[in-house]
């Protein structure tokens, strides 16, 4: 089994914690590779190469996207393609098992809009004035339409109902964006990436799991961690 990870030059010096990444991945990659006995390869990128790939990544996607997040993925896929034509990737575990901070922080969870885009002002400021005068209204209408379309049970508590809505918001919007990004960058690199966490049976099952079961002790992706306790993976993972 061959596994890959990506890092950046001098990341050990300049890494800063954030809501999305409270710890550097490098702290756990070695533990994981050793536990599963994989032939692990770490791809190290630098800022110059990532910046120079911005235009190519945008053209590969066909629309403006995640800028350096796209170009770094493009370079990473290109490195993997040197050895393999097909690989597995872990996209969407955060969406269906509650790994993002907006599943756990009340002030974000109950915000009456998309949790990852609570304001469109900054994004809209990048566009020519008047190009999308109703941009904020469009975003809010899409949010309300998704929430209204979410199936809930009469017995759901307010928290359980909101978690179902959050699940739909993530799978219908955030997850789709990640999948389109992964598909565009990987196929541009002649690499086929498969995403087992997106199997419809797993997604359907996860949707129907009570939040207390999905997030035991309030842990991000708690049920997924529980599934691999014991002899499967190191306790740090």
Task: Label every PLM stretch briefly.
Residues 234-237:
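Short, intrinsically disordered, charge-balanced linker/junction segments flanking boundaries
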């Amino acid at each position: 089994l061959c596994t890959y990870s990506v890092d950046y030059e001098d990341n050990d010096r300049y890494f800063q914690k954030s809501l999305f990444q409270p710890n550097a991945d490098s702290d756990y990659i070695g533990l994981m590779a050793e536990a599963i006995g994989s032939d692990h390869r770490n791809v190290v990128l630098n800022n110059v190469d990532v910046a120079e790939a911005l235009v190519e990544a945008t053209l590969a996607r066909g629309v403006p996207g995640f800028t350096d997040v796209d170009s770094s993925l493009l370079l990473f896929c290109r490195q993997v393609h040197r050895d393999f034509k097909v690989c597995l990737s872990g996209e969407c575990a955060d969406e269906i098992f509650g790994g993002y901070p907006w599943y756990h922080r009340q002030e974000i969870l109950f915000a009456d809009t998309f949790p990852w885009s609570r304001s469109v002002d900054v994004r809209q400021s990048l566009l020519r004035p008047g190009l999308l005068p109703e941009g904020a209204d469009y975003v809010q209408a899409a949010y309300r339409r998704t929430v209204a379309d979410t199936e809930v049970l009469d017995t759901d508590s307010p928290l359980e109902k909101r978690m179902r809505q959050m699940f739909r918001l993530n799978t219908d919007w955030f997850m789709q964006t990640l999948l389109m990004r992964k598909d565009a960058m990987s196929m541009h690199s002649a690499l086929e990436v498969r995403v087992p966490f997106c199997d419809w049976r797993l997604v359907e099952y996860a949707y129907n799991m009570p939040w207390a079961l999905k997030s035991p002790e309030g842990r991000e992706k708690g049920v997924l961690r529980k599934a691999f306790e014991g002899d499967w993976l190191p306790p740090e993972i």
